[in-house]
Amino acid sequence: MSQEIVIGGGKRTPFGDFGKSLKDIPLSDLATHSAKATLTDTNIDPVDVDHLVWGNVLPVDPDGFYAGRVAALNVGMREESCALQVNRACGSGTQAIITAAQQIMTGHSKIALAGGGENFSRGGFVNQKMRWGAVRGAQPFEDSVEWAYNDPFGHGLSLIHI
């Protein structure tokens, strides 16, 4: 089944220095901003979008775990529309585009919106032992941002293989 897929336009999420101007902005707000700008520039009515696919490595806010769905509803997509969040390390945004194209190619969507973004400035410190009660000794906190940079496959390898 061959079908032409068209990328109608695109906007990027804002880009800033770690801990500076974007440190207080939730990931879903960044997703909403780029999705809304893309829809405006392409003159697409949000109610016509069937699916939003969002790529993200480090969900740093309560609504960051499903930032794509939050953004979909924020921009005015139908409640019946679908959303999906993908994590493929550094290739998450690229995977979002691929997955959105697959939604169209398989007939699951006529119009799909794809994007990706991070806000590492909002990454927290984690203590995995405290939930179940640490018994003794020092209980250090780990920087979740470091997890993203030091994943077991090395920074950037996922994108190379997509």
Which residue ranges define each predicted feature?
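Short, flexible, mixed-charge acidic loops at enzyme active sites
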Residues: F65-A72, N127-G137
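Generic secondary-structure signature for well-ordered alpha-helical cores
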Residues: M1, T13, L39-I44, L73-E80, ...
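Glycine-rich, flexible loop/turn motifs
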Residues: K11-P14, F18-S21, E80-C82, S121-R122, ...
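Conserved catalytic cysteine-centered active-site region
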Residues: I25, N56-A112, F141, E146, ...
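Conserved small/polar residues in nucleotide/adenosyl-binding loops
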Residues: I160-I162
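Short glycine-aspartate micro-motif
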Residues: I7-G8, K110-A114
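Acidic, glycine-rich active-site loops and adjacent beta-strand->loop/helix elements
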Residues: K11-P14, G55-P59, R88-S92, G116-S121, ...
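Conserved active-site "lid/cap" helical segment
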Residues: M1-V57, D61-A71, V75
